[in-house]
């Protein structure tokens, strides 16, 4: 069992029950999945970009991402339907908790001028999104071997019904909120 998973069961669940007054353990919000998405519009010109991005996401997530394709053609962006334009990976279970652990303890503190993540990035339904500008904040990525700096979106999906519950859940995982 992952370190954060044990921490969730032993410390987070009792803390949230006390704070929000849940009657059942099953009411306590939990993280269901973490989705990493890398949009690569520049991949239209060069197919190598997709391969490099897939390699980077594989190292970061620990599992192979799926290449996302354009749903419809957009002439202004020179994209045809079916063109590979991104990569995404969904983490659940043990891999999800291990990634969250690495994100909070190692990766986020490596961001330049890091003061904490925004507490306003919730979607109104208890899910949280973080945009990362550079993939080199993850220790798995070797700075000398990357071809370009690419950003990615990290989406944390929870079972929380409100943003306050989700923020309390993530804060109990030592998420560094600045507000």
UniProtKB/Swiss-Prot annotation:
Cited Pfam families: Ribosomal_L5, Ribosomal_L5_C
Family membership: Belongs to the universal ribosomal protein uL5 family.
Ranges in a coiled coil: none
Record's subunit section: Part of the 50S ribosomal subunit; part of the 5S rRNA/L5/L18/L25 subcomplex. Contacts the 5S rRNA and the P site tRNA. Forms a bridge to the 30S subunit in the 70S ribosome.
Protein name: Large ribosomal subunit protein uL5
Annotated source species: Burkholderia multivorans (strain ATCC 17616 / 249)
InterPro entries documented for this protein: Ribosomal_uL5, Ribosomal_uL5_bac-type, Ribosomal_uL5_C, Ribosomal_uL5_CS, Ribosomal_uL5_dom_sf, Ribosomal_uL5_N
Domain of life, per lineage: Bacteria
GO-annotated cellular components: ribonucleoprotein complex; ribosome
Gene: rplE
MF terms in GO: rRNA binding; structural constituent of ribosome; tRNA binding
Keywords recorded for this protein, A-Z: Ribonucleoprotein, Ribosomal protein, RNA-binding, rRNA-binding, tRNA-binding
Annotated HAMAP family: Ribosomal_uL5_B (MF_01333_B)
Function: This is one of the proteins that bind and probably mediate the attachment of the 5S RNA into the large ribosomal subunit, where it forms part of the central protuberance. In the 70S ribosome it contacts protein S13 of the 30S subunit (bridge B1b), connecting the 2 subunits; this bridge is implicated in subunit movement. Contacts the P site tRNA; the 5S rRNA and some of its associated proteins might help stabilize positioning of ribosome-bound tRNAs.
GO biological process: translation
Gene3D superfamilies (alphabetical): 3.30.1440.10
